[in-house]
Amino acid sequence: MNRLLQKGTSLVPSWRTRGCRYRRCSYAPQLHAKPLEMETSQRRMNPLNIQMLSKGFHEQIFRGKQVQHAEEDVQRSITHLKNHELWGQETSTVPDVELQLPKMYGNNIEEHFQILAQKQSLPYLEAANDLLNCQLPAMPQTWAWQSGWTRYTATGEKELVDFPDEKAMVFDVEVCVTEGCCPTLAVAASPQNWYSWCSRRLIEGRYTWSKELLLSDLFPLETSMNCNYMTKNNWTERLVVGHNVSFDRAHIKEQYLIKGSKTRFMDTMSMHMAISGLTGFQRTLWMASKYGKKKGLQEVKQHIKKTRSNFSGSPISSWDWVNISSINNLADVHALYVGGPPLEKEARELFVKGSMSDIRTEFQELMRYCALDVQATHEVFQEQFPLFMERCPHPVTLSGMLEMGVSYLPVNQNWERYLDEAQTSYEELQKEMKKSLMKLANDACQLLTKDAYKEDPWLWDLEWDIQESKQKKTKISKKQKKANEAAESVGNKLVEDHNEDPGPPTEKEESRPSMGKLYLEDLKLKTLPLLPKRNQHLPGHPGWYRKLCPKLEDPDWLPGPGLISLQMRLTPKLMRLTWDGYPLHYSEKHGWGYLVPGRKNNKLNNEEEEEIIPCPYRAIEDIYAEYSKNKTKDGCLSQHSTIPEEFMLTDDNSMWQKVEELSRTEMDLSSEVPATAKAKKRNNSSEHPVKLEMEFDSLPDNHHGNSPCGDVNVSGCWFYKLPHKDGNANNVGSPFAKDFLPKMEDGTLQASTGDSSATRALEINKMISFWRNAHKRISSQMVVWMKKNELHRTITRDPEFDEENKYGAILAQVVSAGTITRRAVEPTWLTASNARADRVGSELKAMVQVPPGYHLIGADVDSQELWIAAILGEAHFAGIHGCTAFGWMTLQGKKSSGTDLHSKTASTVGISREHAKVFNYGRIYGAGQPFAERLLMQFNHRLTQEQAAEKAKQMYAVTKGIRRYILSKEGEWLVEELGISVERGEENSVNLQDLRKIQKDATKRSRRKWNLVSRRIWTGGTESQMFNKLETIAMSPSPKTPVLGCRISRALEPTAVKGEFITSRVNWVVQSSAVDYLHLMLVAMKWLFEAYDIDGRFCISIHDEVRYLVHSKDRYRAALALQITNLLTRCMFASRLGIQDVPQSVAFFSAVDIDKCLRKEVTMDCSTPSNPNGMEKRYGIPQGEALDIYQILKVTKGVL
């Protein structure tokens, strides 16, 4: 595999040359900022009447560069805005902000960030260079069986040490999973020595250990075991390299100290994602290719059949990318970059499934396995790092990734309280739901009387057969007959005696057994022989009910239908669920759907007709009539459902993954002329090879949905499938799935009127959905608790410190570049939704609570991706802020007047503003019109396919515009040579009709393949200029981010994928630029914290928000530093795109949050079913502060 990397490894010498430019800089900024005196005329407006930075700011940041715009560019911008009815709209202004900024490095904003990042990353680059150029010493043959660290010198000596005192090392940790989270053993290697570490739990072998993790359970990397505090100046810069190194970091003692060390972590898995990472779809194809390309193609075709049945053409034409990429595990990454024999990974299973005793038995072999992983990681690093530096050359990228790798989440005793109360609430609601379901089952069982079930729209097709009670037939002998007659006479005597007054019993009678007891004993003796040897299970009850009840021999037996659950197929029927008023029904072939009455002929036109199931369709008509009556009375139902959780853009960064799922097969056909009408007709004719002959005249007029399934033979009714999020070709396995929660909330999916038990069960299912899905991940979070002497004195000396409370931390295991866009990835914290009043445990993020004497400060970057996409389009179009309709709406649009981006899209298509927001982000992420069609039908299932297609077409025509074609030299020659008349548009382009005409005439001239198109452009839309720029970057020979120059993964470069994966490439431009934005912010904040001695550290970044943990005395200065950081980052973006200015409206955060816990808004009380009293009453955490730039300047007097 080394041949794949010849180009990369040849760059090592040139990287070293560049490395010398990462010089230490003694040039320090001023430590105090002073407010400027107000000038009489500071406000600056650009030619489009948009307020820009004040004169003072512009002079400080852009160093007096004159902003000039060509009159032609201004007029073109005005004309464009007029075409979209935006020119002349009211623009807003705000008071200018006056502040003396810290003195910056270099001659301009770009040099400032360059020098700043070089200064921050230089020590780590030097350490990386040591690892890059070294050969590890020989691996020890035997490993020391002793707790703590052991050093193995080059001479073969072993010595016990406090910690590996090394500047750079490669590292790997192993954990015995069955014993908990405590590290079991570790191996490290430096250019000089090998090291091993063994835990006391492994060596001492006690019977029990504390379940709570303490600092003493972790291994030290920078201090002795008994040292828990070092002054700021005593920490030294160290570099630790590992594969998925965030897992290893979580087991290091010093990383839990609140002040934080200067050790940074370099992840070979993250570097691999940046160099040769794969999209989700590519990972599937890569795995398929392991079994041969034919199988890979087959899987692609199957995927396309499921997602886009009308797709035509060869799906994947290039497989070159498979050979220059791999999935993320160390074995495959090593095979890609290093090659050679495959890594041995069998021993890993012993750590996953084995016990501590097993590990002791195989100690030497397992230590060798861990050491081989360290060696493999070092080999990967040596091949990777030059490639990484070549493909991500800006020092800000490296510095930002190093900072991302030291996340820190403080927690206290409320974390355990949260876990207990969420689990208790979940279990109580589960019991209540089961009780409701059992009641429904018991009530339904009563329908057996007089065959009432036959008229029930839901239960008519259940298993209603009854098991009769059985008894043995026995021959009665003469002796038995006499005994029976005697017993009968005794019984008669008892009856006679019962009718007479017997008087008081005698003493002899009292001592004898009573006649009643004797009678019962006799009855038992006669009954037992009649019972079968094997007890019957609930005779006299219907079959479906018997399956819900545990048998008597079951050790957990309880009376009643205790086995019922939401996962059972009959539960939706027992709950009498309806979809738009129609009862749900299950088909073995098509999954869950619903029955719509009105079918007149429900016989298939096959020779062998199946027997029609007697369905009570009249009862269904009555139910729908009642539903319609109630709907009219309550007002029409909303045509737009509530937004699904995965599209909550402010909650997490999963929007792109969703877009990729829905549009992953969209490919670039730029080299092809669009299909002719004849070809389209041929494709359409084969779209449905087998069609059932159905009587379409009988289809209901008042119902729209997926086409009915004519092969579901239910008398008098059509069967419609429930809409699936991934398209009509997929079946719905359960109507209780997460995707249907919005439909429950808007009333589309509901329990029929009547018994409240079903409605309550539905409500509970929604309430417990979050905790049911997430509780394992949340409960398994690795929390390390600290004793008082392990806490920093800033905590213990604070008046709010309480020795009875617990203080600890969670190190979120964030992969700093977990996707091809270099976005960070982590399964719990980076995907956690905000607290919701109807979701148990959804107050998760608010459980990150600061210790006494500290605050969290942070902010969301306002419309981050929208602004990035907008400024790319503006720089491409006229170089003026607000010169495109998309840019103008992003900067100046107002929700109140309907001129903001989301309101404009909503009014154009007739959808809600929240839904419009999803479509807008989806387009920016590269999703095409088919994505919009499917999403429209998902948001509003009442739309027909035709209506959705029309709305999507209208939306894309207004926003993205119309596709036009710029002819190649060959195409222009044909137009002139053949005298073809064409209509010219923007950039001398032609439309689709003219292109087809040229193709037709050219084919008549010669049968050779003509290359007519040079490139394609979008015209006429509000976003056309932006998309032209995005596609220009995405389809360039070497796509790279415009600001920091990071290149796209080799697995997506055009040379490897040809014209495919366009959605992923367009999305990469915006998302990867957003990562550049984050890295710039992290670098700037680190600079300001160090320069102005602000006591704080990076906490976490969740999508477009950042949070810092800051000592309370510095919280307002930190808030000001965050505002300055945003200003400088925006200016860096504009400068790199050739625009020497920034609009005032985006220069600062709308608000910086100062809070005691992690939550979306400082005013959120985070009331949930598991936290009904909210944060203030239950946990004593009041509302925080949200301060804009003017309020921060007032508090700080403009001084950092």
Curated annotation (Swiss-Prot):
It catalyses: DNA(n) + a 2'-deoxyribonucleoside 5'-triphosphate = DNA(n+1) + diphosphate. It holds the Pfam family DNApol_Exo. The keyword Mitochondrion applies. CDD domains: DNA_pol_gammaA. One of its GO terms (molecular function) is DNA-directed DNA polymerase activity. Keywords: DNA replication, DNA-binding, DNA-directed DNA polymerase, Magnesium, Mitochondrion, Mitochondrion nucleoid, Nucleotidyltransferase, Transferase. It comes from the Eukaryota. Residues 494-512 have a biased composition (Basic and acidic residues). Residues 472-481 have a biased composition (Basic residues). Its EC number is 2.7.7.7. One of its GO terms (biological process) is mitochondrial DNA replication. Involved in the replication of mitochondrial DNA. Associates with mitochondrial DNA. Belongs to the DNA polymerase type-A family. This is DNA polymerase subunit gamma-1. The lineage of its organism: Eukaryota, Metazoa, Chordata, Craniata, Vertebrata.
